[in-house]
């Protein structure tokens, strides 16, 4: 009897690999999002900013910090996908998990992933934002590992976890928005008979999950980016950063929303499509019940 490949299970590291592959595709959009969020006055549109980066530093400047982006996915996404998928497999499989259980599991996985991924996230934000700084203020990290070493040497080990609370809070919401909503939407489409477990279903589920995740995380994403890119002593803490952002008006919390969605939507779609293809091609059959 031929194996039903749609029943295959993913391996714990597939999420990190899929996230890193997606990051390589969407990094320019992530860079634009970060630079828009760190503007103090919000003078440049996404088109103007793109043109400025191209004129000043060339086309390759859109890939500044790509090594840090890949490092972040290999730590952050490997952890959250690994925990979510591994624990989900240990739960009773006789019926689908209720959504609240998926959300709780995704929140826990996101918290772990956010903490583990903070150093890579910090280097990622700094490298992406470097090109907009004056020459004398640029950090000029050669690559992600150089950034980690220099931060530890020049600013201390704990500096690598600057903004960890914000990053972890965002990761919780992001993982709930992405993993649990993706799972639920995909399950609903398939179980209702509207769709099959195929590429079209993966696309529809992932783009819906990306929209939910963007709305949930954008305010925290803006504050996280500001705190990670801040000079020493610029913000006393999360509340200080919140008050600073609030002074810019309600939309200050949604700076860069369009590029954030434009980046997160394709990144989420690619991540889940890569993940599902890895599962179908290289996953393993579920154990047979005795």
UniProtKB/Swiss-Prot annotation:
UniProt-listed GO biological process terms: lipid transport; malate transmembrane transport; oxaloacetate transport; phosphate ion transmembrane transport; succinate transmembrane transport; sulfate transmembrane transport; thiosulfate transport
Residue numbers carrying N6-acetyllysine: 159
Subcellular location: Mitochondrion inner membrane
Pfam families: Mito_carr (PF00153)
Ranges: Solcar repeats: 6-90, 101-188, 197-281
Membrane topology: Multi-pass membrane protein
Keywords: Acetylation, Antiport, Lipid transport, Membrane, Mitochondrion, Mitochondrion inner membrane, Repeat, Transmembrane, Transmembrane helix, Transport
UniProt superkingdom: Eukaryota
UniProt-recorded Gene Ontology molecular function terms: antiporter activity; malate transmembrane transporter activity; oxaloacetate transmembrane transporter activity; succinate transmembrane transporter activity; sulfate transmembrane transporter activity; thiosulfate transmembrane transporter activity
Entry GO terms, CC: mitochondrial inner membrane
Classification via PROSITE patterns: SOLCAR
Enzymatic reactions: (S)-malate(in) + phosphate(out) = (S)-malate(out) + phosphate(in); malonate(out) + (S)-malate(in) = malonate(in) + (S)-malate(out); (S)-malate(in) + succinate(out) = (S)-malate(out) + succinate(in); (S)-malate(in) + sulfate(out) = (S)-malate(out) + sulfate(in)
Coarse class of the protein's main subcellular location: mitochondrion
Membrane-spanning segments: 12-32, 65-84, 103-123, 163-182, 203-223, 256-276
Annotated family: Belongs to the mitochondrial carrier (TC 2.A.29) family.
Cited function: Catalyzes the electroneutral exchange or flux of physiologically important metabolites such as dicarboxylates (malonate, malate, succinate), inorganic sulfur-containing anions, and phosphate, across mitochondrial inner membrane. Plays an important role in gluconeogenesis, fatty acid metabolism, urea synthesis, and sulfur metabolism, by supplying the substrates for the different metabolic processes.
PANTHER family according to UniProt: MITOCHONDRIAL DICARBOXYLATE CARRIER-RELATED
UniProt name for this protein: Mitochondrial dicarboxylate carrier
Organism: Caenorhabditis elegans
């Amino acid at each position: 009897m031929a194996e039903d490949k749609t029943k295959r299970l993913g391996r714990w590291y597939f999420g990190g690999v899929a996230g890193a592959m997606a990051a390589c595709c969407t990094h320019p959009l992530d860079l634009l999002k970060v630079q828009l969020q760190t503007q103090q006055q919000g003078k440049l549109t996404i088109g103007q900013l793109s043109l400025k980066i191209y004129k000043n530093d060339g086309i390759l400047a859109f890939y500044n910090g790509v090594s840090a982006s890949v490092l972040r996915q290999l730590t952050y996404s490997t952890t959250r996908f690994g925990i979510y998928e591994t624990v989900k497999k240990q739960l009773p499989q006789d019926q689908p998990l209720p959504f609240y259980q998926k959300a709780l599991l995704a929140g826990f996985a996101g918290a772990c992933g956010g903490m583990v991924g903070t150093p890579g996230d910090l280097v990622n934000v700094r490298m992406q934002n470097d090109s907009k700084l004056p020459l004398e203020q640029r950090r000029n990290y050669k690559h992600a590992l150089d950034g980690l070493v220099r931060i530890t040497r020049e600013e201390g080990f704990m500096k690598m976890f600057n903004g960890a609370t914000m990053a972890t809070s965002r990761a919780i919401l992001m993982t709930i928005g992405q993993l649990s909503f993706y799972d639920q939407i995909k399950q609903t489409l398939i179980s209702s008979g509207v769709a099959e477990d195929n590429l079209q279903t993966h696309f529809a589920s992932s783009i819906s999950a990306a929209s939910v995740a963007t709305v949930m995380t954008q305010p925290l994403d803006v504050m996280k980016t500001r705190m990670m890119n801040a000079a020493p002593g610029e913000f006393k803490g999360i509340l200080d950063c919140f008050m600073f952002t609030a002074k810019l008006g309600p939309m200050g919390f949604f700076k860069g929303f369009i590029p954030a969605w434009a980046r997160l939507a394709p990144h989420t779609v690619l991540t889940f499509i890569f993940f599902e293809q890895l599962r179908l091609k290289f996953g393993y059959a579920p154990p047979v019940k005795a």
